[in-house]
């Protein structure tokens, strides 16, 4: 072999070694770059998961707050409705003796006396107007004559045997009862058939 051929062979070997060294360095550099990219990807994925969990938690908090707000609003509306419905309860209770007295005046008035007749007509008109006015505000008369006894609406003063009435039926109403918006203000006082 000649010197020139040796030099060419040596140069080829050196180039191969340089390429081999370069390739190993490139591989190490590529591996470290890949490792750092994988670490960065893992870090970003962890941050994404944490952010998604935080978003879900905040959405849950917002939903709970909205539900609580709706519950508070609903309760407040119910309280206002109850206050409106039953604000008149005490006032209506005080009006019941007036209704009773107007009815007694009609029952006990002398209908044969001409002078008292006009007065009784006035009392009857007053009673009708008064009853229709209080009915507009939810006051309802309980007059259970001939109905089955209901302890929620009636107060039994006594029981009496009666062949004309079925057992456990109201045969005499001693005092009418009243409800205000479906709540018993005063039960009707009744005599019940045995």
Curated annotation (Swiss-Prot):
- Record's keyword terms, sorted: Chaperone, Cytoplasm, Stress response
Q: Which SUPFAM superfamilies match?
A: Coiled-coil domain of nucleotide exchange factor GrpE, Head domain of nucleotide exchange factor GrpE
* Compartments in which it is found: Cytoplasm
* Lineage: superkingdom: Bacteria
One biological process term from GO is: protein folding
Pfam families, sorted: GrpE (PF01025)
Family annotation (InterPro entries): GrpE (IPR000740), GrpE_coiled_coil (IPR013805), GrpE_head (IPR009012)
Primary location recorded for the protein, binned into one broad class: cytoplasm
State the Gene Ontology terms under molecular function. adenyl-nucleotide exchange factor activity; protein homodimerization activity; protein-folding chaperone binding; unfolded protein binding
Instruction: Give the UniProt entry's GO cellular component terms.
Output: cytosol
Fetch the CDD domains from UniProt: GrpE (cd00446)
Keyword Repeat in annotation:
no
Its job:
Participates actively in the response to hyperosmotic and heat shock by preventing the aggregation of stress-denatured proteins, in association with DnaK and GrpE. It is the nucleotide exchange factor for DnaK and may function as a thermosensor. Unfolded proteins bind initially to DnaJ; upon interaction with the DnaJ-bound protein, DnaK hydrolyzes its bound ATP, resulting in the formation of a stable complex. GrpE releases ADP from DnaK; ATP binding to DnaK triggers the release of the substrate protein, thus completing the reaction cycle.
Under the heading NCBIfam families, the entry gives: PRK14139.1, PRK14140.1, PRK14150.1
Family named by the database record:
Belongs to the GrpE family.
User: What subunit structure does UniProt give?
Assistant: Homodimer.
PANTHER family linked: GRPE PROTEIN (PTHR21237), GRPE PROTEIN HOMOLOG, MITOCHONDRIAL (PTHR21237:SF23)
Q: What is this protein called?
A: Protein GrpE
What organism does the record attribute this protein to?
Aliivibrio fischeri (strain MJ11)
